[in-house]
Amino acid sequence: MRLHLTFNHSTPATGRKNTKHTLFFGSMLACIISIISLVVPAYGANVSDEKKAKPFTHDNVIDLAMQLAQKPFKEARKAPKELIDLDYATYGKINYQENAAIWGGTPTKFSVQLFAPGFLYKNLVDIDVVENSRAFPIELTESSFSVPNDTIEKLLTQVGQYAGVRLHYPINDDEVKDEFIMFQGASYFRALSKGQTYGLSNRGLAIDVAQPKGEEYPLFKRFWIERPSKYQTAIVVHALLDSQSVTGAYRFGIYPGAPTRVDVDVTLFPRRDIAHVGLAPLTSMFLYGGLDTPDKPDYRPAVHNSEGLQIDRGNGERLWRPLNNPNKLQISAFGDEDIKGFGLIQRHRNFDYYQDLGANYQQRPSAWIEPLNDWGKGQLILLEIPSNAETNDNIVAYWEPQGGLKQAEPYRYSYRITASNDSPSFTNKARVIRSSKGQKQAKGKELLIDYSNIKPQDIEKITIDASISKGKILSSRIVAHPEINGARIFITFEPESTNVAELRIQLRKDEKPVAATWLYRWNSDDWP
């Protein structure tokens, strides 16, 4: 839409300024400018002209996903080989021009920057901005990126598409728009709260994880980003997901802050029956810490993006499972119905626990998943994959619905992701803050667990309910731990004629749980 405005304004013949008329004209002009700002896009650089704009609502994404599911899967367009062959260092020199940021020079608190294709990011994606219920494609031009050489600039311009998107907002400083969420690679995305640095990742969907035929990685192939008004502190991103087995329409309501929250609504259209599908998947890294000690000398006491899995079961029970870096692939399943929440948690928030000046693991976010509609029966799956490097993601957690997904039936799921420092449901409650191997025993193995937020006067009233699936609990005791305003328990156990045993420990007071039930899988390969 183009608006042509003509004003015929003349000064009175007397030469005196007509103040009343001028004030009226100024007010009228201000109103017209305000109206223009509502109907004319203020997107910034690299957005196509209005002739390419199309009406848009989330229903359009659902319709696209439904239509796509009725057609055979078609691989996404790939970046040219020259870009894919770039090494990490060269790709890292390709940066989106800050002065090209979408909405960067407008009153909107948010701005949008984009990722170039290349290196690991082979798939090309389309990105639109939505203003006044119309979608405008963002076009890649020679001014979109700063690049290390002319060859790369030419290749990017010829490609004309991007590999992902990141959003900026004054989350830490009112005067600085920091990156706080990114979508890049397959269906991966990561979010930050105030004061955090990137760690674990979220994914749109997981299919056939750890199955013999190999995992399938769905792709967000197109994004639509709604422009907020200058007063809004939230933003909406829509995404179209596609893979060999399923299509999906996603809506992300994103609320940056302390903590950042992402409300996800997804409608899935399976192309085939899918037995093993993962909802709200989380991917993280655990190298060592707590019960798991390093294989070789390291000045850092712990190295991980997440240290534990927390589950709030449908029956009200809370579970805490310390993570492990096993010698062999380890898969755990926690059956449930109407699960209340789950997450991978980074609980320790002090530098001394990690001693890493570069990685700052104490600033890595936790991710808490809270279903907002009925997820029914299923199981929470935890994968722990052997790893010898902190650059490898080796922890995966997701909800697997019972019965999987059936072909041609639509499925709708809603959930909330909170990028908190801890799980929201554990605020001001007794919680496990340390799990460790104890001293060497003449008989059995000693386990030590520290709990915070337990009053000294309650210690004598607490009982320890400890069990092992194969073996015996030899002893258990609890003592006050004034350094953490909590308690420390010691458990001695003896596995019998087995390589694997499940430990379960619960503190109770007046027959009621004091804290989350502590779970752990003892393995003779990891703890001889």
Swiss-Prot record:
GO biological process, any: beta-glucan biosynthetic process
Keyword Cell wall biogenesis/degradation appears in the UniProt entry: no
Predominant location: periplasm
UniProt keyword list: Periplasm, Signal
This protein's pathway: Glycan metabolism; osmoregulated periplasmic glucan (OPG) biosynthesis
Molecular function, one GO term: carbohydrate binding
Family per record: Belongs to the OpgD/OpgG family.
Protein name (record): Glucans biosynthesis protein G 2
